[in-house]
A protein has these predicted regions:
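Donor nucleotide-sugar binding/catalytic pocket of nucleotide-sugar-dependent glycosyltransferases
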Residues: 56-59, 123, 153-208
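Short hydrophobic beta-strand element within catalytic cores of glycosyltransferases
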Residues: 317-322, 327
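A conserved mid-protein helix/loop that constitutes part of the nucleotide-sugar donor-binding site
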Residues: 19, 217, 224-240, 256-262
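Nucleotide-activated donor-binding/catalytic signature segment of Leloir-type glycosyltransferases, i.e.
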Residues: 262-280
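Short alpha-helical donor nucleotide-sugar binding micro-motif in glycosyltransferases
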Residues: 279-280, 287-292
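Aromatic "clamp/platform" in nucleotide-sugar-dependent glycosyltransferases that forms part
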Residues: 300
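N-terminal subdomain of nucleotide-sugar transferases
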Residues: 1-55, 95, 119, 381
Length: 397
């Protein structure tokens, strides 16, 4: 089929949104589709160096706005302006596509303009329907006011979001990555809603069988140090674990909360047991996943998690909060899920108890094997095959 892909960020050699855009595009082309991709001009050089001349990349740009110069609400406004530009650019090409697939950004709130084209739109996978638990406002600090605004925009004010309503109603299929987002799009009258994990892996990421690592257990945390990611909660939970057994915590990621995390480590007397790596290139992260004993994910608001899937792909058992997208994934013994406590003061201890279970139980290898088995179902070739079946359905109707 002739498929138009919208991927705001797209380049090889990355994880997250940037890698998703590239891997969606290449996987669909490898499946046999004739793929045209719209992405931001910021990625032109990296895309062209990727060596995929079989894919027709285009780079609509917003003049006068450097990519990455705007953050927060200004960044969202720039993205919406790019969306309008991308639609106008696609329409000006005068081509006939069989299907349009918007893969990034995958946001409930930001929509897509491409439903206006004369081809069925597959929208997503998207997230964004989840909101942060109010009892945990202290982890957000000064950002809690902004978080309350986002919660309102996701709740009662979402009905005022014309971009959301138009996209959801006009899309042939909406792919959602968690149940909260599913509920939101159904309220707006989406015609066809299906679950698909937002993230995927290249096939070569999947690990072979692993043995429990020897030596002092290593707990790995990966992500941007943002309030909603709750990196200080990770340190607090590790402090509780450290009271009961030897262990090390390795944290890969940077962001505005890094100084606060450093201070928390010092205040809890953990400097000898915690390694703060800062930002680590995606291609280097594989080594940390492969050498660690357990992955810790304690985000207080997330649609799903690329890092969790990456850890599973390397056979790394996990401890995580039973919340939002992580509550929806069915990974069996690969992860210990910890229910959110009404009393925030109890949560570090509960996370520590779950971590101790993963690290000391006799079934580490079985947990690792379950992680690999689940992650193997979410490679990009598998996602391209699933998307292709949807394309067949929406073009036949």
């Amino acid at each position: 089929m002739k498929v138009l892909v919208s991927a705001y960020q797209c380049a090889p050699g990355h994880g997250g949104e940037i890698g998703n855009g590239w891997m969606w595009s290449t996987a669909l082309a490898d499946y046999g589709h004739e793929v045209t991709v719209l992405t931001h001009a910021e990625f032109r050089d990296r895309v062209q160096a990727g060596g995929r001349s079989d894919i027709d990349f285009h780079f609509p740009d917003i003049k006068g706005i450097p990519f990455g110069a705007l953050i927060g609400l200004d960044g969202y406004d720039a993205y919406r302006r790019w969306q309008n530009t991308a639609y106008e650019y696609a329409a000006s090409l005068g081509r006939d596509w069989d299907v349009v697939h918007h893969v990034g950004w995958g946001s409930l709130h930001l929509g897509s303009r491409l439903w206006r084209l004369d081809a069925p739109l597959v929208y997503g996978p998207i997230g964004g329907g989840q909101t942060a638990p109010g009892e945990y406002w202290r982890y957000f600090g000064r950002d809690w006011v902004m978080e309350l605004g986002r919660s309102a925009a996701t709740g009662s004010l979402l009905r005022l979001n014309g971009w959301t309503k138009e996209t959801v109603r006009e899309a042939a299929t909406v792919l959602v990555t968690n149940s909260a987002t599913e509920a939101a799009v159904r309220r707006f009258g989406a015609k066809d809603v299906r679950y698909m994990l937002a993230e995927g892996l290249p096939e070569e990421w999947i690990s072979g069988q692993r043995q429990r690592p020897s030596g002092v257990p290593v707990v790995l945390w990966v992500g941007r140090m943002l309030p909603r990611k709750a990196p200080t909660l990770a340190v607090q939970a590790f402090a509780e674990l450290r009271k009961t057994m030897p262990a090390r915590l390795v944290m890969a990621g940077d962001g505005p909360l890094l100084p606060q995390v450093q201070a928390t480590v010092e205040n809890l007397g953990l400097a000898a047991d915690v390694d703060l790596l800062g930002r680590v290139p995606w291609t280097t992260l594989a080594q940390y996943y492969s050498e660690s004993s357990m992955f810790l994910f304690c985000s207080l608001r997330d649609s799903s998690s690329a890092q969790f899937l990456e850890a599973m792909g390397k056979g790394l058992p996990a401890t995580l909060l039973d919340l939002h997208g992580m509550a929806d994934v069915k990974v069996g013994i690969a992860a210990e899920k910890v229910p959110l406590s009404r009393n925030p003061g109890e949560l570090p201890g509960r996370l520590a108890a779950a971590m101790r279970t993963v690290l000391t139980a006799d079934d580490w290898e079985a947990r690792s094997a379950a992680a690999i088995e689940w992650a193997s179902e979410h490679t990009f070739p598998s996602k391209a095959a699933a998307a292709s079946r949807i394309y067949q359905e929406v073009t036949a109707s």
